[in-house]
A protein has these predicted regions:
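Beta1/beta-strand and adjacent pyrophosphate-binding region of the FAD-binding site
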Residues: 3-17, 160-165
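Residues at the starts of beta-strands that form the adenosine-phosphate
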Residues: 8, 31, 161, 183-186, ...
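Beta1-alpha1 glycine-rich phosphate/pyrophosphate-binding loop at the start
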Residues: 14-92, 172-200, 269-270
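A Rossmann-like FAD-binding core segment of flavoenzymes
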Residues: 94-112, 118-119, 180-271, 327-328
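Predominantly flavin-linked oxidoreductase catalytic cores and closely associated redox partners
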Residues: 105, 117-202
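AMP-binding/adenylate-forming core of the ANL superfamily
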Residues: 124, 245-248, 289
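FAD-site-proximal beta/loop scaffold in flavoenzymes
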Residues: 142-156, 253-302
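A conserved FAD-binding loop/helix module that cradles the flavin
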Residues: 292-328
Length: 328
């Protein structure tokens, strides 16, 4: 039987938080390995192409390597380039396109099974983010090809009838870019208006487009059914069928709670937050740690790159301390 490769720590997820964990472990002389089902920075890669971060470069930095930007706020492409450079600098061992299927064992003696093979690891860090699983509308027709949960760019939807579901940042930005590119945009919003948390330079813009009728909006309304050539919505007054070519269901995303629960990670029944030690981010399953936005459960607006990047240091210090404690 082929001998399994051994690592001190296996990190599930190679986004900014996963990279930060790998860096801090390397700095302490440990041997980590990172796995991602897609490319390195897979979620960031799938962000809208023209995305601009609502932050300054220094707040995205990891590994004490400066990040520079042409503008006050960095964009997606600059962030991808920066994090690749950091990964190269620290020579991180990243297994791209290798999904982790499961892991078993106990603290110090885990077996990690991927699509390709199995590995040994002393500790596990789950840093898989939340961008992989969209919150579904749960309506008939959602499985049609014209329904899109990830907005990337507007060009393919020129001169098309487009419905945007939602009213937070991704929905507002997507609706504006689609409108500017020549799509006929209708927004369907569950609440009474555009979300108060929308970026300050976006919110008045989208509200003005709606006010002057350039973008149609149905507030306090929900999607009932998606059909090949239209979308049926329920408004406060009646059902309305909207002519439609594409639907952008910008209803948010969530971590893979099922994977966590299946691997002994207990979740808070109200918030779905994993139960962790706040000082170490170790879960109730010894040897399994959580990092980044998955720590926030369904409250995904509580943790961003800006604060999740510090989880790596916290976890690495905890792991190092455990490994150096005298055995009793």
């Amino acid at each position: 039987m082929e001998r399994m490769e051994q690592f001190d720590v296996a990190i599930v997820g190679a986004g900014p938080t996963g990279l930060a964990c790998g860096i801090e472990l390397e700095r302490r002389g440990l041997k980590p390995v990172l796995f991602d089902k897609g490319c390195v920075l897979n979620s960031l890669y799938h962000y809208p192409i023209n995305l601009v971060f609502f932050t300054t470069p220094e707040l995205l930095e990891i590994g004490d390597i400066p990040m520079t930007s042409l503008n006050e706020k960095p964009g997606r492409t600059e962030a991808l380039k920066y994090y690749r450079r950091v990964a190269d600098h620290y020579k991180l061992n990243i297994h791209q396109y290798e999904r982790v299927l499961d892991f078993d064992g106990s603290d110090g003696h885990f077996t990690v099974r991927t699509e390709k093979t199995c590995y040994r690891a002393g500790k596990i860090i789950l840093a898989s983010g939340y961008y992989d699983i969209p919150n579904k509308l749960k309506v008939p027709g959602e499985d049609l090809d014209k329904v899109i949960h990830y907005y990337r760019e507007a060009h393919p939807y020129y001169n098309q009838d487009v419905v945007v579901v939602g009213a937070k940042n991704s929905a507002a930005i997507g609706a504006l870019e689609l409108f500017w590119t020549g799509a006929r945009v209708t927004m369907v919003v569950r609440g009474a208006g555009i979300d108060a948390g929308v970026k300050y330079w976006i919110k008045p813009n989208i509200e003005n487009r709606i006010k002057c009728g350039e973008i149609k909006a149905y507030f306090q309304s929900t999607v009932k059914e998606i059909r090949e050539h239209d979308v049926v919505i329920q408004t406060p007054d009646s059902e309305v069928a909207i002519k439609n070519d594409f639907v952008f269901a910008m209803t948010g995303y969530r971590p893979d709670f099922e994977f966590m629960a299946a691997h002994g990670i207990h979740l808070d029944p109200e918030t779905s937050k994993p139960i962790t030690d706040p000082q170490t981010l170790e879960s109730e399953r010894p040897g399994v740690y959580l990092a980044g936005v998955i720590v926030a459960g369904t409250h995904t607006n509580e943790i961003f790159i800006e604060n999740g990047r510090f989880h790596g240091r916290l976890i690495a210090e905890a792991i190092t301390q455990k490994l150096t404690e005298p055995q009793t």
